[in-house]
Amino acid sequence: MATGKPVVMIVMAGRPLTIGRQVDQAAAVLYAFHGGTMAGPALCNILTGKVVPSGKTPITFPKMVGQIPLYYNRHNTGRPSYDPPMLIDSIPIGCPQFSIGQSSYWLETPTEPLFPFGFGLSYTTFEYGSTRIDTLPFREGQGVGYSLSCTITNTGSYDAYETPQLYVRQLSGDLVRPLCELKGFQKIFIPAGETREVIFTITDDDLGYWHESHDGLSSRVWFATDDVDFRFAILPYSQSL
């Protein structure tokens, strides 16, 4: 690296590692996990450009060990975060404490991971359109259904696969719900310069969760969907909605 020649770092591991310092020094990172007996030819095809990479991270990569446990579908703390952190030397002398941004983290570490869940780069680029939602006819035993769609354009120079992901956030409810939840994904092939439409279908059951109550002597468990507002988005990787 001291010579200035670009270096591609290949990581073979079965779990996310804290590799922030190495990522800063490498020109690119290829996380191979445990690729099996054909890992060598597969990596060679990616590095030489025979194959355009299309993998997505199935886990969240932390910036540091202190962030663990770290997961995309965490609960909301109800407190705002401030990213990047406010440096103490940049705070004016004598200012009231509330002027520094009311910063608070859900963990006492940076708020963002090194690589979020569902993230992955390609040799090409993709542009996502707005998510559209349509209500489907009521079906006995399934309740109301919803069709969610968006267009994805390959704006780069290479034919490639992309994996759009459907995320849902429940804005209120009987219990605190995650900031976002993965409800579906698809892998689609999009030639360079072309546009494809991706469609997801979900029902009321896909938006429900398990409830539990106790009265001191017994407990009751049931599955239900809250009659509240939801937010939907088709995204290239997990983001807070």
What is each of the regions a protein language model found here?
Residues A2-V7, A26:
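A short helix->loop->beta-strand "cap" motif at the edges of active sites that frequently abuts
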Residues D204-D206, F232, P236:
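Short leucine-rich amphipathic alpha-helical surface patches
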Residues T155-K187, R196, R231:
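Terminal accessory/anchoring regions of large secretory-pathway or extracellular enzymes
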Residues D174-L217:
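Intrinsically disordered, low-complexity Pro/Gly/Ser/Thr-rich segments with frequent PxxP/GP/PP motifs
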Residues M12, P16-Y161, Y167-R169, E212, ...:
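Secreted, periplasmic, or luminal enzymes acting at the cell surface/secretory milieu
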Residues S238-L241:
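Short beta-strand elements
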